[in-house]
Amino acid sequence: MTDHSHLAAVRDSYDTVATTYAVRVPRPSELDPLNRAMLAGFAELVRAGGNSRVADLGCGPGLVTAHLASLGLDAFGIDLSPSMVGIAREGHPGLRFAEGSMTALDVADDELGGILAWYSTHHTPPEELPRVFAEFHRTLAPGGHVLLGGYIGEDEHLSPAEAYGHPVSYRSYFLPLDRLAELLRGAGLVVAARLEQAASGRAKRPDVCIVARKPERP
C-alpha cells in the first residue's frame, strides 16, 4: 500500500466499525494490572516533567484520553477517523479531539510533555514508522515521554476481511520488541523501560509497553 492508501484504508475501516468498536473496546478500568500501572506511571513521569500537555494518538472513542485527564494531564486526542472523533467528542465534551494523522501532526515543535500511542501504531507499515517516530521527537519537549503500547510478532502482517462484525480493508503489522525499540532510538528517543507480556485471556498475541523520552538539551 502507498502512504495515502494505507491511511485511507485505516480511516475508512474505523469509520465503518466506530460505533461497535466504542461499545466493545475495553475500558481503562478493564485493562490488566500491568497495563494500568504503565499508564499511571507514564502520567506520573509527565507530571513530574512540568509539562502536562499530552497527545493521545489514535485515540478512538476517547476512553484512554479521558483516563489520562483523570490522572491530572492536559490530554487531547487525535484520530484519523471522523466517526471516532465524533464519538469521542460526544462522550467527553470537556476534552478536545481532532482529526489527524500521526505521520504529520498539527502540533508545534517541542510542545508536548507526553505522547501516548496506545495500540495505534500497528496499522502503520514498518517503512513508515521512522516518519511517525520522527514526529514524536519533533513535537515532544526536551525531557518529554512517549508511552507506546501494542502487539508484537516476528515481522508478521495480517489483512483481515472483517473486524467487529464489519468489513475492513486495513492491514496490521506486528514487529519484534527489539525492532520497535531500535526504531524509537533511531528517531532520537531514549528507551527507558520495556514491558512484554505473553498472550493470555483477551490478548491473543504478546503485547508490549515501551516508555521512551526525548533527551534534555545539553
Explain the meaning of each model-derived region.
Residues 1-49, 154:
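Conserved class I S-adenosyl-L-methionine
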Residues 53-57, 61-104:
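Class I SAM-dependent methyltransferase SAM/SAH-binding core
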Residues 103-115:
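A short acidic, Gly/Pro-enriched loop at the edge of an enzyme's catalytic core
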Residues 130-142:
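A short glycine-rich, Lys/Arg-flanked "PGG" loop and its adjoining helix->strand segment in the class I
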Residues 172-187:
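Short alpha-helix
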Residues 199-218:
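Core SAM-dependent methyltransferase catalytic element
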